[in-house]
Amino acid sequence: MGYNIFNPAEVVPEYTVDVGTKKGEKVDYAIFINGQPAILIEAKSHEDPLTTYDAQLYRYFSATTAKFAILTNGILYRFYTDLSETNKLDNAPFFEIDLLSIKDAAVAELKKFHKEAFDAESLFSVAASLKYAKRVKEIMGAELKEPDDDFIRFFLKDIYAGKATQRAIDDFKPIIKKALNQYLNDQLNDMFKAAI
C-alpha cells in the first residue's frame, strides 16, 4: 500500500488510544498522514471471526482523529468509517476484500487507500457510494433468490391488469423469479459472447 512500516512517523505499531476511563489501550497499527492518525488497523488471527472485535475497534475509532478503520484477520479485510454519525464507527463495513477471492473491482477500490492516492475527503465519498451499492446488491440478491410480496407488486403494476391480491402475487412470484433469473443469464451470455 506504499506506507513505510519502518518509519514510525508513518506506521505506528501498538498505537496507544486512551478510551474514556480505559487508559493505554492499543490499536495494532495506526497509519499517520500529515502527522495525524488517518487509518487504524486491528489485526487478528486468521482463525478468529472478525465480528467479535467490532466493539473494540469502535472504541479506538471514537477516541482518535482517524477517519478510517480496518479490521482484518489477514485474509478478510473490512473497511469502516463514520458515515452514519460523526466520530462513531458504522456497524457495518463499507467495503470488504477477501484475499482468497479477489475481484478486479475490489482491487480498484483498494488502490484508493494507497499512500500516493490517499485523499480522506474523496475516500469518504467513495465509502458512501460503496456502502449503499453494497446494500443494493444484497437486497437485489435476496430478491432474486426469494422475492418478497412488495417486489412482486412492483412488477405486477406494469404487467397485470387485475388487482394485486395475495393470490395474484403468489401466482406471479415463480414467473417473475424465473424471468429475472433468465434475464440475468441472458445478459451474462451476451457479455461472454462479446468477449469471445
PLM-predicted stretches and their roles:
Residues 1-68, 79-196:
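A short, conserved, highly charged catalytic patch centered on acidic carboxylates
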